[in-house]
């Protein structure tokens, strides 16, 4: 099945010129890898967070958002994840895309120039129109108000 395609303008900043554009690892990947646009390697110590530049500016079309998410391998193997996951990039943001990483392991982790540090998805965002009501007549569900572990372990 062919996926819908949209054009998104992207600009490489001077410190990101030699890095690849965000790209899909496989034909069916949902997210595109983002690369660390660092001049020098940095050490991300346990429980430390750092804002890592990607060297790109993107113009997300109106009606879409960018979602910055962790890479599963970094999280599973090294405890490195995106702190505000998913990080939202609004369609009117025109600054450099940066990734807020945190080290949840007990070992320091070195981030080098060109490392794949996160992934980005460009997803549709509908405009919500709230219908403010006095009484809620929605049909009952099996879950109702259950949350925070109510559906089992």
From Swiss-Prot:
It is an enzyme of class 3 (hydrolase). GO terms for molecular function: dUTP diphosphatase activity; magnesium ion binding. It holds the Pfam family dUTPase. Its EC number is 3.6.1.23. It catalyses: dUTP + H2O = dUMP + diphosphate + H(+). Its cofactor is Mg(2+). Pathway: Pyrimidine metabolism; dUMP biosynthesis; dUMP from dCTP (dUTP route): step 2/2. GO terms for biological process: dUMP biosynthetic process; dUTP catabolic process. The keyword Plastid does not apply. Keywords: Hydrolase, Magnesium, Metal-binding, Nucleotide metabolism. Substrate binds at residues 71-73, 84, 88-90, 98. It comes from the Bacteria. Belongs to the dUTPase family. PANTHER family: DEOXYURIDINE 5'-TRIPHOSPHATE NUCLEOTIDOHYDROLASE (PTHR11241:SF0). This enzyme is involved in nucleotide metabolism: it produces dUMP, the immediate precursor of thymidine nucleotides and it decreases the intracellular concentration of dUTP so that uracil cannot be incorporated into DNA. This is Deoxyuridine 5'-triphosphate nucleotidohydrolase. The gene is dut.
């Amino acid at each position: 099945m062919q996926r819908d395609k949209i054009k998104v303008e992207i600009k490489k900043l001077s410190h990101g010129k030699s890095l690849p554009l965000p790209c899909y690892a496989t034909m069916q990947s949902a997210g595109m890898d983002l690369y660390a646009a660092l001049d020098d390697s940095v050490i991300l110590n346990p429980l430390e967070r750092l804002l890592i530049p990607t060297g790109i500016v993107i113009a997300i079309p109106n009606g879409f958002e960018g979602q910055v998410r962790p890479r599963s391998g970094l999280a599973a193997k090294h405890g490195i994840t995106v702190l505000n996951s998913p990080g939202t990039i609004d369609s009117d943001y025109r600054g450099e895309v940066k990734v807020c990483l945190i080290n949840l392991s007990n070992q320091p982790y070195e981030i080098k120039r060109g490392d794949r540090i996160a992934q980005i998805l460009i997803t549709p965002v509908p405009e919500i129109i709230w219908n403010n009501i006095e009484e809620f007549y929605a049909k009952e569900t099996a879950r109702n108000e259950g949350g925070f572990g109510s559906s089992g372990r």
